[in-house]
């Protein structure tokens, strides 16, 4: 299972199930095999801060 940190603003926003952006302090489980991303709370193992299919980045002009 891959976790990435989610923040309310910045370059590391995760679009998760229901098109919800994870709030600050939450983790995003990147979906695999057709599964949707899910927001979770609590501790997780952060994944590498790389450009993966499950990542979502806002263009800077919208920050």
Curated annotation (Swiss-Prot):
Region Interaction with fibrinogen-binding exosite of thrombin, annotated ranges: 55-63
Modified residues (Sulfotyrosine): 62
Organism superkingdom: Eukaryota
Statement: the UniProt record of this protein carries the keyword Disulfide bond: yes
Record's subcellular location: Secreted
Pfam families from the UniProt entry: Hirudin (PF00713)
Region (Interaction with thrombin active site): 1-3
Principal subcellular localisation of the protein: secreted
UniProt-listed SUPFAM superfamilies: Leech antihemostatic proteins (SSF57262)
Keywords associated with the record: Disulfide bond, Glycoprotein, Protease inhibitor, Secreted, Serine protease inhibitor, Sulfation
Disulfide bonds: 6-14, 16-28, 22-39
Stretches for region Disordered: 39-63
Protein's job: Hirudin is a potent thrombin-specific protease inhibitor. It forms a stable non-covalent complex with alpha-thrombin, thereby abolishing its ability to cleave fibrinogen.
Protein's UniProt name: Hirudin
Source taxonomy: Eukaryota, Metazoa, Spiralia, Lophotrochozoa, Annelida
């Amino acid at each position: 299972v891959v976790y990435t940190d989610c923040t309310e603003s910045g370059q590391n926003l995760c679009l998760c199930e229901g098109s919800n952006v994870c709030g600050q302090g939450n983790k995003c489980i990147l979906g695999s095999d057709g599964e949707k991303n899910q927001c979770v709370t609590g501790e997780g193992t952060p994944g590498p801060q790389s450009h993966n299919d499950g990542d979502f980045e806002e263009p800077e002009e919208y920050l």
